[in-house]
Curated annotation (Swiss-Prot):
Glycosylation sites: 40, 71
Organism (species): Homo sapiens (Human)
Pfam family, one: V-set
Primary subcellular site in the record, as a coarse category: membrane
Domain Ig-like: 20-109
Protein name: T cell receptor alpha variable 26-1
Primary role: V region of the variable domain of T cell receptor (TR) alpha chain that participates in the antigen recognition. Alpha-beta T cell receptors are antigen specific receptors which are essential to the immune response and are present on the cell surface of T lymphocytes. Recognize peptide-major histocompatibility (MH) (pMH) complexes that are displayed by antigen presenting cells (APC), a prerequisite for efficient T cell adaptive immunity against pathogens.
GO CC annotations on file: T cell receptor complex
Length: 109
């Protein structure tokens, strides 16, 4: 019998300076499955990047990935940016309990 754990991924609203992004307040997924974390940034300008960070309990923020127009992938995650750049999705390909954190979507130059 396979035990399926739930991974709770907490997201925050806005950015540190401006409320240029909106995200769901929280979401969860089954362990081992992909977690798709959406972010809306409808007022993004042409030279602003989308950055994703996460903060695990009692630790400082950790950089995950960033992109301008193209989709990006690294060893931690993938970033899908829509063609009009008004929204993006961070994809954690195989979420585990270690991925439980507060995730920040930030738009900046």
């Amino acid at each position: 019998m396979r035990l399926v754990a739930r991974v709770t991924v907490f997201l925050t609203f806005g950015t540190i300076i401006d409320a240029k992004t909106t995200q769901p307040t929280s979401m969860d997924c089954a362990e081992g499955r992909a977690a798709n974390l959406p972010c809306n940034h409808s007022t993004i300008s042409g030279n602003e990047y989308v950055y994703w960070y996460r903060q695990i309990h009692s630790q400082g923020p950790q950089y995950i990935i960033h992109g301008l127009k193209n989709n990006e992938t690294n060893e931690m995650a993938s970033l899908i940016i829509t063609e009009d750049r008004k929204s993006s999705t961070l994809i954690l390909p195989h979420a585990t309990l270690r991925d439980t954190a507060v995730y920040y979507c930030i738009v900046r130059v």
